[in-house]
Amino acid sequence: MQFTRQQHWQFLEDELKAETEEYKKKFLSPAMSLLKDSGEMFVGQLVALKDGEMIVRFSNNRSLPRKGEFLLCMLLQQELRNYRNWGDCTYRDLYKNRYNASDSVCIWHSASPDKEYSLVGFSRVSLDFAQQVAETPGVILVFAPQRPPIDYMLNLQRLVREELTPSLSSVLDANYQCNPQSNSLIKSEDTADYVYKQLLLTNSMILQGPPGTGKTYLIAELCARLCSEGKSVLVTAMTNRALMEIAGKPALSQMLQSEHVFKTNITIDEHKENKHLEPISHISPMPSCLILSTYYIASGFAAELSLPLPFDCVIMDEASQALLAMFGACKKMGKRCLWVGDTKQLAPIVSLNRDRIRFGEYGHMVDGFNLMVESGKYPVFQLTKTYRFGQRAADYTGLFYNNTLIANH
């Protein structure tokens, strides 16, 4: 089974269209209609930035953002901060005239001393955006429907158009056969040392980690060891939460204190959680340093690379959530690659429906991790000791892993 570059590109194009179809209607809609008619756009005044949250005051004359709703927060040009000046402007027009913007999520509502207004708290606001608006207390902010993650798809499309990068071709152009091998079970007491030694023997390997087997701890320990040897390391994951879990592990405490751990797109709540985590606007390999970045940003770095393999090691966490092309991006970025995931977890969530995936034969391009494991092209190692369950629960969970799990007593 082999995919042409056109097949790779077409899958990403179809997914891109599916993701943007509904959003495009809103993006081209009059902003006043979204504000007054559908209640999908909101205008508020910054009150404070406190304890990792952004507090904004909204009028009770219109609907408020719903708790749990993800929104794009925009700082517009001075004239457009007054919605009465919007006229026929569309959401797209406002977006083009933003000074800065950040993703945000509504987390609470509260009454205001002035009964005509309500206070709303937001988290996940980027640190650079928060620092900019903090300079102008009381500034007017506009909240709009969040953009779908189209940059991820666009970055991967650029990558699949590259045909002269051997490391990328080793994933995208490979002839995959269903040739599953038995996972090599890791029974060593020092799993991080075992994985480290195996990584020295191959330039790419897969680590299968059932629930509670210490994948995050292992990644942190491995990063600390590699960086202590002067290596440059990139860890990429689907979510910022996974990256923050890694940053919070004890193995990285010394590196954090010495300002050797960096993360892209740090939010104010992440900064509150880990004040020693260094913000970095662009990915750049540095000796003895660890960089944490999501697939969305790391894929852009890979697409921009003119010279491949800048990092000594790239570790992909949450690999079961990665599209096949993202594995190619990792190969382009790192001399050595470690993919960490669990084939029993959910495959990547895509907007294309099942019929379209089946008709286009896109299944393996969606579930890249399972294809990599089943093909037998790379050595696969499995963690066997679970720290989350007793033996009885480990036995039940182990039914999905050929009865290989044992509880850590």
Go through each PLM region and give its residues.
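Pre-ATPase regulatory/linker segments immediately N-terminal to the P-loop/RecA-like helicase/translocase core
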Residues: 2-15, 59-200, 256-264, 274
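Charged, low-complexity interaction regions that mediate assembly/partner binding
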Residues: 1-67, 81-84
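Conserved P-loop NTPase motor core of helicases/translocases
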Residues: 82, 179-181, 224, 232-314, ...
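Hydrophobic positions on the alpha1 helix immediately C-terminal to the Walker A/P-loop
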Residues: 218, 222
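Conserved helicase motor core of SF1/SF2 NTP-dependent helicases
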Residues: 229, 237-241, 296-299, 309-313, ...
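Walker A (P-loop) phosphate-binding loop of P-loop NTPases
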Residues: 212
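Pre-Walker A (Motif I) flank of P-loop NTPase domains
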Residues: 200-207, 231, 288
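Conserved lysine of the Walker
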Residues: 215
